[in-house]
Amino acid sequence: MKIIAGLGNPGQKYDKTKHNTGFMTLDHYLNEKGLSLDKDKFEGHWTKQKINGEDVILLEPQTYMNESGRSVSQIANFFKVAPEDVLIIQDDMDMPIGKIRIRANGKSGGHNGIKSIIRDLGTEKFNRLKIGIRHPKNTTVVSWVLTPFNDEQQKLMDDAFDTSVKIIDDFIAGRDSQYLMNKYN
């Protein structure tokens, strides 16, 4: 079994903001597959599906970004999913808008959602699908991550969302992190 979790903040106020890149990516995947998040438990919206013959949990934590680990760890513990079978979709300010990078493990890079997951899973050894939102140029970090993408930026993100569907499918199919990094980084 695999868990794919997109990170973001709940509520319409945060809908379509840069910090909700994880939610937007997972929503794109769900839309492409004709699926929806039909359960509310483990402090998240989620669904359990069979995709290409594999059991998969698709999750959007509803704890706010900084406490995402609570939701991810609750569902991983309940379904007995090992951390290496977890893929977290996150925004990354250290990469250009729409750039994708796969990581098999590592520190949080200052991302509070990832810090929370490391704390609550008790390990850094889980997979990440990072999508760039770049650092702000003439505004604060908080203002930057809580604003939507402009039209030009959104086109780059749409390409990233399309590529992410392939990455998620490869992860579900059991492709290891080294394969994913070689193919998509």
Curated annotation (Swiss-Prot):
Per the UniProt record, the site (Discriminates between blocked and unblocked aminoacyl-tRNA) maps to N9
User: Which GO BP terms apply?
Assistant: protein quality control for misfolded or incompletely synthesized proteins; rescue of stalled ribosome
Q: Which EC number(s) are documented for this chain?
A: 3.1.1.29
Q: What is its main location?
A: cytoplasm
> Catalytic site residues?
H19 (proton acceptor)
Instruction: Kindly list the GO CC terms recorded for this protein.
Output: cytoplasm
Reactions catalysed, semicolon-separated, are:
an N-acyl-L-alpha-aminoacyl-tRNA + H2O = an N-acyl-L-amino acid + a tRNA + H(+)
- Identify the InterPro entries for this entry: Pept_tRNA_hydro, Pept_tRNA_hydro_CS, Pept_tRNA_hydro_sf
Q: Which domain of life is it from?
A: Bacteria
User: Gene3D superfamilies given for it?
Assistant: Peptidyl-tRNA hydrolase
Q: Which UniProt keywords apply?
A: Cytoplasm, Hydrolase, RNA-binding, tRNA-binding
- Where tRNA binds, per the record, is at Y14, Y64, N66, N112
- Subcellular location per the Swiss-Prot or TrEMBL entry: Cytoplasm
* Family recorded in the similarity comment: Belongs to the PTH family.
Which proteins does it associate with, and in what oligomeric form? Answer: Monomer.
Question: What is this protein's function?
Answer: Hydrolyzes ribosome-free peptidyl-tRNAs (with 1 or more amino acids incorporated), which drop off the ribosome during protein synthesis, or as a result of ribosome stalling. Catalyzes the release of premature peptidyl moieties from peptidyl-tRNA molecules trapped in stalled 50S ribosomal subunits, and thus maintains levels of free tRNAs and 50S ribosomes.
| Identification of the protein by name | Peptidyl-tRNA hydrolase
Q: Which organism is it from?
A: Lactobacillus helveticus (strain DPC 4571)
